[in-house]
Each structure stands twice: as C-alpha cells, then as structure tokens.
C-alpha cells in the first residue's frame, strides 16, 4: 500500500493530507486538514494574492505536523511527498512546492509536483466507489469550467470549456452584484432556497462556430452576468426592495441547466456511460440534484465528489499523486518550479526529466 503526504496552497486554502492506496485500489484518507482564509479575503471581496501567500507560510507547517501525527506516520515511512505546482497564484503555489521539496529532500523520499486540476479529477476517487475509466468529467470551479474525457490509461482530452468566466467566478460576481458577499456560491445557494427560480428569464450563453451554429459543449457566462445586471437595474427602477431570493434562484437554476445539459449531451455523443462532477461548484445542491436526475433519465451513471472534497483540499492532490505512482511515475524533476497557468492536457510534462518550467 502506497502512502503520500500531500500539500495544497494554490489559492486561498492551506491544506495538508496523508492518503494511501488500499489493497482494493481505493483511496483512504488517513488525515486531512484545511486552514481557510475565506473570512479574511471576504473583507476585500475576493482573494488578495499577497495575503494568501503570507497566510500559507504561517499555516502550512502546523497542518503538516497535525496530519502526520493523526496518521501516526513519519515522512521517512511515506512513498512520496506531493504538492500542487500548477496552475494557481504563483506566490501561493511556491509555499507548498518549496515545503514539499524540502521535506522530500530531507527525508530522501520522491517528490511529485501535481497539476491542481488533476487533483480535482482525482477527488471522485475519495468517494465510496471510484469511477473506472473511460468517463467524462465536468470540472466546475472558481477558475475552471471544463468537460474532460478520461481514457482507459488515464489520458485526458478536453472536449468543452468556458470561453470567459468560469461558473464559480460567475457566482462570485453575481453575489457581489446582489450584495451577498464572498464566496458567492454558498451565499447564493443559501438565499436561493426560498426563491422562485422561474421568475426571471435569463440567457444560456453559447459559443458561435465559424461555419455557423454553436459549439455543443462550450460555455459562456459573461452574457448571463450582464443579463443579471440589467435585471437588477430594472428591479431597482421599479422601486422597493430587490427580490434577492428570486434573483438568486433564477441565476442558480440557469447555471445548473447549462452545465447539466451540455455535460449530458457530451457524454452521450461520445458514448460515455459515466459522468463525474468535481470542483467547488459541484457542492451546489441544485446542481447535484439536477445532474443526478438527468443522468438517470438518460442512462448516464453520475459520480459526484464528496462535499468535503469539492473545494480545494490536499486529499485530492494525494489521490492524484497515488494515481501517478501506480502508473510508474516516481518523481518530478528537482528543478521544476511553479506555473500560474498550465493546461491540463500538458500535465504529463510535470514529470519529465527536463522540467517544463
């Protein structure tokens, strides 16, 4: 059984975890800790990179000690140390990367630099039953909205993406517009529960093809954001209080509709009978229920990352590292740095002898 210490500091969550492969190939989380900075960044209406980096430096050492103590393991007993190295905030990424490399070198164990999105894809393995490839992944988070096909040998192919705002980013911006605070996803979900999702008609943004028609699997949320602004302005011009619950519910519903419709269509068009949903927005209850309902109607088996592992965490980074180890990847180059941007399709380059960055 292989065991990994994993570190995650790509944005505003400091996290450490110890995970291992069990005899049946499933992933067991021995310990997982997260230090959130949400309340501090909420004062600024979003993540402040310099503050995030400083808080990671302060929080990560204690988190590492806690997960090692809880798992009753020393670093020398591990098969590897893993850390997110791309993509994310460069200064924040450096904290986990430098910490992980240092610990690995001191204790003479391999180091694995992990792609953050590969971690999100692996988060589905932290549930009761890990999906077996091939399958389609809907990755929907604050920075990414993508449809990715995972092949039999773990190869990844992007089939759809957002051309502007990610879904999670749209939640944050609309929440700010409605005065609901940060982060937007939980804030909108909380007030939308009591709202009428059919009160306001909002657009389902599409991406035009050069030869005519629309891309069936791509996303656009900028037009929806503009439509929400105009709807709010129209309500304000009528006087009285804003119907916040109805606005939030209408917005939440159209985002869920778009994500589910295009994901299910993509799965069916590519003869994929499994669809996995991961990322922070996958925690949205309306989206989870709609995806499960539509999957059942169309004969597509739906797997959703456990709520505890939808948002950024180190357990998913550990799960991705275990996947790499099981495929014979032993180490990243000691010279590899971090990258604020790095496409998931080029994740294999993180393990080359000659570093990609």
Curated annotation (Swiss-Prot):
Cofactor: Fe(2+)
Cofactor note: Binds 1 Fe(2+) ion per subunit.
Signal peptide segment: none
GO biological process: tRNA threonylcarbamoyladenosine modification
GO MF entry, a single one: iron ion binding
Keyword annotations: Acyltransferase, Cytoplasm, Iron, Metal-binding, Transferase, tRNA processing
Enzyme Commission no: 2.3.1.234
Residues reported to bind Fe cation: 116, 120, 312
Location in or out of the cell: Cytoplasm
One Pfam family of this chain: TsaD
GO annotation, cellular component aspect: cytoplasm
Domain of life: Bacteria
Function field: Required for the formation of a threonylcarbamoyl group on adenosine at position 37 (t(6)A37) in tRNAs that read codons beginning with adenine. Is involved in the transfer of the threonylcarbamoyl moiety of threonylcarbamoyl-AMP (TC-AMP) to the N6 group of A37, together with TsaE and TsaB. TsaD likely plays a direct catalytic role in this reaction.
HAMAP family: TsaD
Family of this protein: Belongs to the KAE1 / TsaD family.
NCBIfam families found in the cross-reference section: gcp_kae1 (TIGR00329), T6A_TsaD_YgjD (TIGR03723)
Name this protein carries in UniProt: tRNA N6-adenosine threonylcarbamoyltransferase
Organism in which the protein naturally occurs: Synechococcus sp. (strain CC9902)
Recorded name of the encoding gene: tsaD
């Amino acid at each position: 059984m292989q065991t990994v210490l994993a570190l995650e500091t790509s944005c505003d969550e400091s996290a450490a975890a110890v995970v291992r492969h069990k005899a049946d190939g499933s992933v067991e989380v021995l310990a997982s800790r997260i230090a959130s900075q949400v309340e501090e960044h909420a004062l600024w209406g979003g993540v402040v990179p310099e503050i995030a980096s400083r808080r990671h430096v302060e929080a990560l050492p204690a988190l590492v000690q806690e997960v090692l103590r809880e798992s009753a393991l020393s670093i020398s007993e591990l098969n590897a140390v893993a850390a997110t190295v791309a993509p994310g905030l460069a200064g924040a990424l450096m904290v986990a990367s430098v910490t992980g490399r240092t610990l690995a070198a001191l204790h003479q164990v391999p180091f694995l630099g992990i792609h953050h999105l590969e971690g999100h894809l692996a988060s589905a393995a932290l549930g009761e039953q890990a999906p077996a490839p091939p399958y389609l992944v809907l990755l929907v988070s604050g920075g990414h909205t993508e449809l990715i096909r995972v092949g039999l040998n773990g190869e990844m192919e992007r089939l759809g993406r957002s051309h502007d705002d990610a879904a999670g980013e749209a939640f944050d911006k609309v929440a700010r517009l409605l005065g609901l605070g940060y982060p937007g996803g939980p804030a909108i979900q909380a007030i939308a529960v009591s709202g009428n999702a059919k009160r306001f008609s909002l657009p389902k943004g599409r991406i035009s093809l050069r030869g005519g028609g629309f891309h069936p699997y791509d996303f656009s949320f900028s037009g929806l954001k503009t439509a929400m602004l105009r709807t709010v302005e129209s309500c304000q011009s009528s006087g009285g209080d804003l119907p916040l619950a109805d606005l939030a519910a209408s917005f939440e519903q159209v985002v869920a509709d778009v994500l589910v419709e295009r994901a299910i269509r993509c799965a069916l068009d590519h003869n994929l009978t499994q669809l996995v949903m991961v990322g922070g927005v996958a925690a949205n209850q309306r989206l989870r229920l709609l995806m499960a309902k539509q999957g059942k109607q169309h004969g597509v088996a739906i797997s959703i990352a456990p709520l505890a592992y939808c948002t950024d965490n180190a357990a998913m980074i550990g799960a991705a590292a275990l996947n790499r180890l099981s495929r014979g990847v032993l180490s990243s180059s000691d010279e590899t740095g971090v990258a604020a941007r790095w496409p998931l399709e080029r994740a294999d380059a993180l393990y080359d002898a000659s570093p990609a960055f």
